[in-house]
From Swiss-Prot:
Assembly behavior: Homodimer.
Pfam families, A to Z: ATP_bind_3
Primary gene name: ttcA
Keyword presence, Nucleus: no
Motif (PP-loop motif): 86-91
Name under which the protein is recorded: tRNA-cytidine(32) 2-sulfurtransferase
The protein's Enzyme Commission number: 2.8.1.-
HAMAP family named in the record: TtcA
UniProt miscellaneous comment: The thiolation reaction likely consists of two steps: a first activation step by ATP to form an adenylated intermediate of the target base of tRNA, and a second nucleophilic substitution step of the sulfur (S) atom supplied by the hydrosulfide attached to the Fe-S cluster.
Family matches, as PANTHER family: AMINOTRAN_5 DOMAIN-CONTAINING PROTEIN, SULFURTRANSFERASE-RELATED
Length: 338
């Protein structure tokens, strides 16, 4: 006979088959309830960490944009800045950050959000006006049916991006004049600038990138890229946090430039294999040594003479340059025996 020792405050456990099943069901129910309670409380536990990370992200974005504005004198006292808003994450992020910085900037400047509705089929024309109206800022929606023009000119199956871009650019320059704009702000970020550099190198035979500030091709406008220091992944995170009403960029049916896609994937692969390489390459764009390239229009090789003055950028001629060893993802370098 099975006997269970108990005290006065504890009931004897029923060890019969039915009793064991009932006991297991009670324990299972208790475990499920505990799991449900833990799951319900998890978001509350994660919230402070998410808030901290979001706050750090916001500070980083504002710092990087502010640094670019200062380094390249992008925005000056009294400027009227036209922010080109397409409905993508980058232009939303640019507008959002500039509005934040406008409140704390040491100078006064105006912001005008401008969108060009090119009458692409399926384009949700109500989204941007509603969003911008809620922000309570000055904005302008320019409606021009460039889509029909491009469809007539470009053969079926060919990319429409180039002509579409030229038409869009001309219209935006006109709008900038009409609105008395002094600076045109575009949402290109650090990754765009690096991709453009390699596109020019691989397919154009030029060491040419995407400048943070330039005079427009018509000679009449200053174009700025305040997101020059910002990584695309940070803009993606910020867009998710702010829940921007994103409008897809493929409504026209035209595929993104294949070459740009390939370069973008190459850079992502490099960054995955060699963490930090993207940052190093971007830094290189800001540290150009013309005397160590081969463009005779940028450096007077023919007129080179001995000066007797040491040059920090001068060649050591017989010595190979040494560089820090690249860190491989997941690989620990222990050192050599020599």
């Amino acid at each position: 006979m099975n006997a269970v020792w108990t005290d006065n405050d504890t009931q004897a456990e029923d060890l019969s088959p039915q009793g064991r099943v009932a006991s297991q069901l009670v324990r299972l129910k208790s475990d499920l309830q505990a799991f449900a309670d833990a799951t319900a409380s998890a978001p509350a536990t994660r919230e402070p960490k998410i808030e901290r990370e979001t706050h750090k992200l916001e500070k980083r974005l504002c710092r990087q944009v502010g640094q670019a504005i200062m380094d390249f004198n992008m925005i000056e006292e009294g400027d009227r800045v036209m922010v080109c808003v397409s409905g993508g994450k980058d232009s939303y992020g640019l507008l959002d950050i500039l509005l934040k910085m406008q409140q704390r900037a040491p100078i006064n400047f105006e912001i005008v959000a401008v969108n060009l509705d090119q009458k692409q089929p399926g384009f949700p024309a109500h989204i941007l006006p509603e969003y911008l109206a809620k922000l309570g800022i000055e904005f302008h929606i320019e409606t021009q049916d460039t889509y029909s023009i491009v469809k007539k000119v470009i053969p079926e199956g060919k990319t429409m991006c180039s002509l579409c871009s030229r038409l869009r650019r001309g219209i935006l320059y006109r709008v900038a004049d009409e609105l008395k704009i002094t600076k045109i702000a575009l949402g290109h970020h650090r990754d765009d600038m690096l991709q453009t550099f390699f596109l020019n190198m691989f397919f154009g035979g030029k060491l040419k990138g995407m400048p943070p500030k330039l005079v427009s091709d018509d000679g009449g406008h200053i174009v700025i890229r305040p997101l020059a220091n910002v990584a695309e992944k940070d803009l993606t995170r910020w867009a998710a946090h702010r829940q921007f009403p994103i409008i897809p960029c493929s409504l026209c049916g035209s595929q993104e430039n294949l070459q740009r896609q390939l370069i973008g994937q190459m850079l992502r692969d490099w960054e995955k294999q060699y963490p930090g390489r993207t940052e190093t390459m971007f830094t290189a764009l800001q540290n150009v040594v013309p005397s160590h390239l081969m463009d005779a229009t940028r450096y007077d090789f023919k007129g080179l003479k001995i000066t007797g003055v040491p040059d920090a950028d001068g060649d050591r001629v017989f010595d190979e340059e040494t560089f820090p060893m690249a860190k491989l993802a997941g690989v620990q370098v222990l050192g050599s025996s020599c």
